[in-house]
Structure formats: structure tokens, C-alpha cells
From Swiss-Prot:
InterPro entries: GcvPA, GDC-P_N, GDC_P, PyrdxlP-dep_Trfase, PyrdxlP-dep_Trfase_major, PyrdxlP-dep_Trfase_small
Family: Belongs to the GcvP family. N-terminal subunit subfamily.
Protein name in UniProt: Probable glycine dehydrogenase (decarboxylating) subunit 1
Keyword field: Oxidoreductase
Assembly mode: The glycine cleavage system is composed of four proteins: P, T, L and H. In this organism, the P 'protein' is a heterodimer of two subunits.
Annotated catalysed reactions: N(6)-[(R)-lipoyl]-L-lysyl-[glycine-cleavage complex H protein] + glycine + H(+) = N(6)-[(R)-S(8)-aminomethyldihydrolipoyl]-L-lysyl-[glycine-cleavage complex H protein] + CO2
EC number in record: 1.4.4.2
Function: The glycine cleavage system catalyzes the degradation of glycine. The P protein binds the alpha-amino group of glycine through its pyridoxal phosphate cofactor; CO(2) is released and the remaining methylamine moiety is then transferred to the lipoamide cofactor of the H protein.
Any one GO molecular function term: glycine dehydrogenase (decarboxylating) activity
Gene Ontology terms: biological process: glycine decarboxylation via glycine cleavage system; nucleoside metabolic process
């Protein structure tokens, strides 16, 4: 869509039409002391000057080897991703309300949705959400709408920022949140769910791998949840689905999660995208846009926005959400990422992440002053290590050696004093892991 700003002749004509001489007269009703002062902006720069200016700013950043995750992860992004999403046809998140005019954009959304459905084993995906936290909160709202109940059970293993977002969404509602505490093994035991879920429970929200990296027994938990006629919301790291059972296989009703691991850079925490997939019975209650495939009157394949009567531009305050397509560019990155890896490549990538994390785990827990918090548990990317050493000292020594160390879990939960959350992805080499363990041994 072309955008050409007004020239001086256009501006003069508009001012004459509304009967004023200068744009500043539009603001006469605003007291002068409340008006913005003149902005201290220098004159224009040449391309070379601009490049040098931002290069100087960027040079102040310190590049570190990362062993920290906790929601945002250092994964390799194939060059294919940037090549595709950087095309002018895609370089915007916005889908116009005359959406059928943008067939390429709609097809890319449709392909993304198809891949998310294949990955999760569920029937319908939306066009994406803002991030994992909002996707989780929207899943809770969906469950409340669909069930007509007002009690939500949430695992303590849910990312704490996701939990806070859910609480914010429900702050002025009548919904009740009950926290399911993790066991000493770092998981939610099915007996704990069985004791807490009742006829008033709208949904049970379980994250796997959970915030501590531990993989939950989702099939066993699903059996308990389904026996009580409650909805099961699975919060996932999509990369883990390369090796672990899909939500569709263990009969989850809703699957959500953070899509950053699928081709989006860390970017200091965002922007990324969230994904959501649901069983067919819930698709009318699902938030966000949905692209569908159809044929025109001549039998040609085409794409449309479907089930639009759920949305804000039609339902207004009765809409399922105010989510539109503002995260679609990042979702497109996820689509390209998944397509590029393919089934076998994606599985192999997940296996490499498991292998490298296990290698680091075995090295670290063998050091004096370090031990596993959750022994003999399957984990993905992340693991918790308990230490008798000074954590602040460890972090500072690692920083001096160019390493962003693990997360100090005491800042998240006081029950995890002296505990560190390590993260190891496919980006980390054995040499880097060995260097990490050498520094920890000397700390």
C-alpha cells in the first residue's frame, strides 16, 4: 500500500478549507503551558551518517554467551527466516479489514495455522497472539466462557510472569484461581489434581516442560482432569514437541505457548508471538483471527478471514478478545522456521537440545558444591541446580568471563533459595559448556 505524505500545496489547501492559517491554530484550545515544547531533534542525516550513529550505539552492547532461559531462549535462526519475512510483501503485521485483498498475507497465516495444528495435534489454530503470557491468559478466558464455571487450577510450574498476566486478566472477574503446588520431584502429581479438581472447575492449566524445565506426565494428568469434566489447557515449549507427545495425543482441549523459539530473536524479551490451538468444539470461543481456505465462483483456491462474527469489528464488546494480527510477522517467522526444518529436522533439533542440556547437567552436578534439585527427572533445555556457593559471586565471575549465568531462583520463589536455573540450547558448544563448568568449579 503506497504512502505519500502531503506536499506544501496540499497542506495549504487543507488549511484554507478549514479556515485557518497555520497548523498550530488547531491546538489553541490547549493551554500553552501544557503543550509539548519544541523537540530537540537534529537535522537530517545521510545514510552513512545514520549507519555510523547506530553502529556506535550498538558497539556499547556487551555480547555474552548465554546459559539463561526462563521464557526467552537463545536458538539459532536460519537465514531463510529473515530472507522471507524481510520481503516487502510481508514486512508489516497488519491485515486490512478488506482482508481478501491481501491473499498472500492470508495464505501465510493459513499455512502458519496448519503447521501449529500439525504440531499440537489439535483441530484449529488462530492467527497468533501477542506472546506466551497473553496466550495463556486468553486460554483461561476461553475456558471460563466455554464451561460457564468460575474455578481455575493452575500449576505452580507455570511461568511466574504468565501467572501474573492471568491474575491481571481476571482481577475484576468472579473467577477463582487455585494454585497446584509442585512436588519435591518438581512436577504436579496426579493425586494433587484429583484432590483439587471438582464440578466447579472450568480448567486445569499445566505447563510442560514447566518453568523449572521438568517434563510433566501430561497423559496421566489428562486422565484425571477428563474424569472430572474439566478442560485441560497445556502450556508448551513448541520445540519440545519435536520429541514429546503432542497435546492432541493426550487429549488436551487447548494448547498455548510462547513462539519465540520458532525463529524470533530474543530482543530483550520481545516482541515475539503466542500460539493457540483448540479442539473443534471450542473454535467459536477462540480469540483472534482465523484464516480459512475456500474457492471463488470460478473454482480457484482463495483465502478469507473466517468465523468473523467472534471478532471485535463485528461483536464489539461481546467479542472473544481484542487480539487481531499484530504478531503475524513473528508468526510468519515461525511458519518459515518450521517449514525450513521439516519433520525430521525439527525432531533432530529437539534431540540436540536435550542432549546438550543433559551433558551440561551431568558436568555441573558432579562439581563440588553443586547438586541436582530434581534428580532422575526428564527435562528439556533447563534444569535446576542447588549450590552451597555464593550465587552473587558466581554470577559476577561468569559475567567477567563473558557468560550470562543461570537465573537465581530465589528472586522468583523463596522456597528455591540457593537454586540456579540453567539453560542450554543447541547454540551452546561443548567447549562453552566445559568452560562454564571450569569457572563454576573455581568460583
Amino acid at each position: 500500500m503506497d504512502y505519500t505524505p502531503q506536499n506544501q500545496k496540499d497542506k495549504k489547501k487543507m488549511l484554507e478549507t478549514i479556515g485557518i492559517d497555520d497548523v498550530s491554530e488547531l491546538f489553541d484550545t490547549i493551554p500553552k503551558d501544557l503543550r509539548a515544547k519544541k523537540l530537540n531533534i537534529s537535522g537530517g542525516k545521510t545514510e552513512q551518517e545514520l549507519l555510523n550513529y547506530f553502529s556506535d550505539i550498538a558497539s556499547e552492547n556487551k555480547v555474552l554467551i548465554s546459559f539463561r532461559g526462563a521464557g526467552i531462549y537463545d536458538h539459532y535462526i536460519p537465514s531463510l527466516v529473515g530472507e522471507v519475512i524481510g520481503r516487502s510483501e510481508f514486512w508489516t503485521a497488519y491485515t486490512p479489514y478488506q482482508a481478501e485483498a491481501s491473499q498472500g498475507t492470508l495464505q501465510s497465516i493459513f499455512e502458519y495455522q496448519s503447521l501449529i495444528c500439525a504440531l499440537t495435534g489439535l483441530d484449529t489454530s488462530n492467527a497468533s497472539l501477542y506472546d506466551g503470557a497473553t496466550a495463556t491468559a486468553e486460554a483461561v478466558l476461553l475456558a471460563l466462557r466455554a464451561s460457564g464455571k468460575n474455578k481455575i487450577l493452575i500449576s505452580q510450574g507455570l511461568h511466574p510472569e504468565y501467572m501474573q498476566t492471568v491474575k491481571t486478566y481476571l482481577e475484576n472477574s468472579k473467577a477463582e484461581i487455585v494454585t497446584l503446588n509442585i512436588s519435591e520431584n518438581g512436577v504436579i502429581e496426579k493425586d494433587a489434581v484429583d484432590a483439587s479438581v471438582d464440578d466447579d472447575t472450568a480448567a486445569v492449566i499445566i505447563q510442560s516442560p514447566n518453568f523449572f524445565g521438568v517434563v510433566e506426565d501430561m497423559q496421566a494428568l489428562s486422565t484425571v482432569i477428563k474424569s472430572r469434566n474439566s478442560l485441560f489447557v497445556a502450556v508448551l515449549n513448541p520445540l519440545s514437541l519435536g520429541v514429546f507427545m503432542s497435546p492432541g495425543e493426550y487429549k488436551a482441549d487447548i494448547a498455548v505457548g510462547e513462539g519465540q523459539v520458532l525463529g524470533s530473536a530474543m530482543r530483550a524479551g520481545g516482541a515475539t508471538f503466542g500460539f493457540m490451538a483448540v479442539k473443534k468444539a471450542l473454535e467459536w470461543k477462540m480469540p483472534g483471527r482465523i484464516a480459512g481456505q475456500t474457492t471463488d465462483k470460478n473454482g480457484n483456491r482463495g483465502f478469507v478471514l473466517t468465523l468473523q462474527s467472534r471478532e471485535q469489528h463485528i461483536r464489539r464488546e461481546k467479542a472473544t478478545s481484542n487480539i487481531c494480527t499484530s504478531a503475524s510477522l513473528n508468526a510468519l517467522a515461525g511458519c518459515v522456521f518450521l517449514s525450513g526444518w521439516g519433520n525430521d529436522g525439527f525432531k533432530n533439533l529437539a534431540e540436540i537440545n536435550i542432549s546438550k542440556a543433559r551433558y551440561a547437567f551431568n558436568k555441573i552436578k558432579s562439581l563440588k558444591g553443586f547438586k541436582s534439585k530434581f534428580e532422575n527427572k526428564v527435562f528439556f533445555n533447563e534444569f535446576v541446580i542447588e549450590t552451597s556457593k555464593n550465587i552473587k559471586k558466581i554470577q559476577n565471575i561468569l559475567l567477567k568471563n563473558g557468560i550470562l549465568g543461570p537465573l537465581d531462583l530465589s528472586c522468583i520463589n523463596e522456597n528455591f533459595k540457593n537454586c540456579l536455573l540453567f539453560c542450554v540450547t543447541e547454540q551452546r558448544t561443548k567447549a562453552e559448556i566445559n568452560r562454564l563448568t571450569e569457572i563454576l568449579a573455581e568460583a
